[in-house]
């Protein structure tokens, strides 16, 4: 079982003040150690997956080495992000040009469920990177590994059993990637189907076995990062949001 760091209360991490966020993370570490006897997790799950580069300093000071982010907040920073309106398109503010980087996604695919979806660059949006924060008062740099959850695929996975065909666009779009893409399923499991016994004991098991027969390797975040370390030079910008 992989344990994540979380908060004592359900806050939007991205807007919490440094000292308050640090106190909550430390409290979670303390209570986790009391419950499980130790707390060795180096990973962080921000509530609602709401992340901001402004919290990187706090996370590193708490001994956190990596955090989950939403992969839509990588895709929306790319200079060739394809704006799409209506079903499966942008249903929130358009990407802020201040967040735009010169990098291009080049290979894109669009997907939606229940009219909600997005545009994702492959393999860019399915690879862990480094992200950094520079303290404006001291100019000190803080860096952390960011691990993108698969927004669209997680939504599908959270509501019904899925097949490995869901991964086909990602596999097809990443034949020359130096690191294999990581498709991270993460969702509000208890809010839908993806959190009960049939999900964990049947769907996850069946999907994992089917993926293995196609040469896809089931893994955990720590194992992936150990097998495929993120180069310190692979620094990206992450758009604020969840």
Q: What spans do the regions from the language model cover?
A:
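Metal-dependent polysaccharide deacetylase catalytic core of the NodB/CE4 family, i.e.
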Residues: 1-48, 142-157, 180-186
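His/Asp/Glu-enriched short active-site or ligand-binding loop at hydrolase and phosphoryl-transfer sites
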Residues: 65-79
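Short, solvent-exposed turn/loop segments enriched in Gly/Ser/Thr/Pro and often Arg
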Residues: 7-9, 43-52, 72-73, 222-225
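Generic structural signal for well-ordered alpha-helices
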Residues: 22-32, 56, 171, 204-208
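Short, charged, surface-exposed secondary-structure boundary motifs
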Residues: 13-16, 75-84, 230
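Short, surface-exposed basic-aromatic patches at helix termini and helix-loop junctions that form
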Residues: 53-68, 200-214
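Extracytoplasmic/secreted cell-surface and envelope-processing proteins
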Residues: 53-54, 76-78, 194-196
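Active-site and substrate-binding clefts of carbohydrate-active enzymes
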Residues: 83-152, 161-242
């Amino acid at each position: 079982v992989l344990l994540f760091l979380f908060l004592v209360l359900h806050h939007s991490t991205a807007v919490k003040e440094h000292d308050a966020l640090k106190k909550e993370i430390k409290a979670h570490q303390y209570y986790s150690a009391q419950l499980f006897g130790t707390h060795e997790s180096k990973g962080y799950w921000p509530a609602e997956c709401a992340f901001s580069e402004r919290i990187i300093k706090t996370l590193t000071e708490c001994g956190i080495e990596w955090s989950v982010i939403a992969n839509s907040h990588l895709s929306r920073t790319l200079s060739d992000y394809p704006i799409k309106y209506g079903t499966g398109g942008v249903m929130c503010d358009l990407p802020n040009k201040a967040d735009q980087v010169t990098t291009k996604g080049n290979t894109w695919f669009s997907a939606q469920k229940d009219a909600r979806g997005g545009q994702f660059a492959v393999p860019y949006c399915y690879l862990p990177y480094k992200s950094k924060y520079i303290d404006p008062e001291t100019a000190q740099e803080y860096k952390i590994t960011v691990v993108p959850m698969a927004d669209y695929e997680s939504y599908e996975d959270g509501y019904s059993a899925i097949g490995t065909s869901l991964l086909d666009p990602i596999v097809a779009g990443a034949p020359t990637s130096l690191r294999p893409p990581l498709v991270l399923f993460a969702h509000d499991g208890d809010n839908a189907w993806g959190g009960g016994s049939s999900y964990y004991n049947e769907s996850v098991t069946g999907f994992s076995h089917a993926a293995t027969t196609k040469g896809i390797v089931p893994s955990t975040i720590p194992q992936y990062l150990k097998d495929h370390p993120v180069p310190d030079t692979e620094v990206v910008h992450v758009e604020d949001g969840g």
